[in-house]
Amino acid sequence: MATEEDVKQRQIIESRARNISHNVRCTECGSQSIEDSQADIAILLRKLIRDEIKSGKSDKEIYKKLQADYGETILYTPKFDLQTAAIWLSPVIVGGVAAGVWAYKKHRQRTNVHIMALNLVRGVPLTPREKETMLDVLTPPPPANKWWWPGK
């Protein structure tokens, strides 16, 4: 007969095995954890996890062994390193650079007209009203198309 301590020990092993199995991807099914899959490899991996727990290994050691044997994609939570950060942050960086280039071109286009107009009349004595009129005449009208995309 199993003692109460044996039953508790089996329950602890079972709960640890289930917890680890929920975080390990089935290599055949792809989208299922090995806990939910009935593929042969999933059954084999569940048995391997239970055997490793019974031999006294920690969860971290089991995850490392699985990752070493089957690659990083077997785990649902891949490690966060420089390459992963670059992959996740690259769209934000590209968007920021594109917005910066757009804003720079927009600002540069607006300021160049005023600089050119002021350089045109450098040394010519003009009243402030005449300067304002000259800038109004030389400044191109805003585009009729208010959309950022030319086709709209």
From Swiss-Prot:
Residues 105-152 are mitochondrial matrix. GO terms for molecular function: metal ion binding; oxidoreductase activity. Pfam families: CcmH (PF03918). It is found in: Mitochondrion inner membrane. Residues 1-83 are mitochondrial intermembrane. The keyword Iron applies. Heme binds at residues 26, 29. The chain crosses the membrane at residues 84-104. The keyword Iron applies. Gene3D superfamilies: Cytochrome C biogenesis protein. One of its GO terms (cellular component) is mitochondrial inner membrane. It is a single-pass membrane protein. Keywords: Cytochrome c-type biogenesis, Heme, Iron, Membrane, Metal-binding, Mitochondrion, Mitochondrion inner membrane, Transmembrane, Transmembrane helix. GO terms for biological process: cytochrome complex assembly; embryo development ending in seed dormancy. Belongs to the CcmH/CycL/Ccl2/NrfF family. Plays a role in mitochondrial cytochrome c maturation. Probable component of a heme lyase complex involved in the reduction of apocytochrome c. This is Cytochrome c-type biogenesis CcmH-like mitochondrial protein. The gene is CCMH.
